[in-house]
C-alpha cells in the first residue's frame, strides 16, 4: 500500500451507507457508477463532485465483504462508523500507520492523550522515512494531519478535548469484528 495525500477526501459515512444499501437492494454488480449517478445516491451537485465522491466510495467498497456492506446499513451508528473507518484504513497507509504507531502505542502504555506535538512528531518521522511524504507540500502535510484527526474522530477512536485528543476504544458490534477477523484485514483490528 502506497502513501497517498488524500486531502480532498472526506469520511463519507452517509454516502457509503446509501451506496451499500442501493447495492444490496438492487443486487448491483455492473454499471455501479452509472446507476448511482442516475439515482443521485451520492447526492452531488456537479459532475466533478460526483466523480470525486464515486472514486473514493468505490475504492473503499472494494475493501468490504458483502456481509460488511450489509452490516454498515443495518448496524448501530458506532459500528457503521467503525466499518467505514476500516474501509479507509484498508486503503490509506498514512492513517493506518498513525493508528498503529501512535494511537495503539499510547493506548497500550495507558496514555490516553494525543497532543498536537504527537501529530507533528509522527509527520516528521514519516517524512524522514518516506520520500513520497517528504515531497508533499507543507499545506498537503497540514491537510493530512487534519484528515487523520477527522477520520479517527468520526471513526470513534479519538475525542477532541480543549487542547488535545482523548483516545477511546469504540464499542463495535461483535458480528462486525468477527466478519473482519474471518474475511477481512485482521491486522487493522
Task: Walk through the language-model features, giving the residues of each.
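Eukaryotic partner-binding/assembly regions in large regulatory complexes
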Residues: 1-82
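Leucine-rich, amphipathic alpha-helical/linker segments
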Residues: 2, 6, 19-22, 26, ...
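Amphipathic alpha-helical interaction surfaces
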Residues: 60-63, 101, 105, 125-129, ...
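Short acidic alpha-helical/loop segments enriched in Asp/Glu that coordinate divalent cations
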Residues: 69-73, 108-116, 133-136
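Positively charged, polyanion-binding regions of nucleic-acid-associated proteins
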Residues: 83-86, 90-113
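DNA-recognition alpha helix
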Residues: 115-129
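Accessory, usually C-terminal, subdomains that scaffold auxiliary metal cofactors
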Residues: 134-189
Amino acid at each position: 500500500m502506497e502513501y497517498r495525500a488524500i486531502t480532498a477526501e472526506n469520511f463519507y459515512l452517509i454516502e457509503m451507507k446509501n451506496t451499500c444499501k442501493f447495492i444490496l437492494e438492487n443486487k448491483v454488480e455492473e454499471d455501479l457508477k452509472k446507476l448511482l449517478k442516475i439515482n443521485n445516491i451520492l447526492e452531488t451537485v456537479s459532475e466533478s463532485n460526483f466523480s470525486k465522491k464515486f472514486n473514493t466510495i468505490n475504492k473503499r467498497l472494494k475493501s468490504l465483504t458483502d456481509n460488511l456492506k450489509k452490516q454498515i446499513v443495518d448496524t448501530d451508528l458506532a459500528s457503521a462508523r467503525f466499518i467505514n473507518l476500516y474501509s479507509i484504513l484498508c486503503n490509506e497507509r498514512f492513517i493506518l500507520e498513525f493508528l498503529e504507531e501512535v494511537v495503539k502505542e499510547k493506548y497500550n502504555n495507558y496514555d490516553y492523550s494525543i497532543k498536537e506535538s504527537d501529530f507533528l512528531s509522527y509527520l516528521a518521522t514519516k517524512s524522514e522515512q518516506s520520500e513520497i511524504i517528504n515531497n508533499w507540500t507543507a499545506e498537503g502535510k497540514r491537510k493530512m494531519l487534519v484528515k487523520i484527526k477527522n477520520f479517527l474522530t468520526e471513526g470513534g477512536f479519538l475525542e477532541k478535548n480543549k487542547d488535545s485528543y482523548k483516545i477511546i476504544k469504540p464499542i463495535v458490534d461483535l458480528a462486525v469484528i468477527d466478519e473482519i477477523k474471518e474475511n477481512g484485514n485482521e491486522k487493522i483490528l
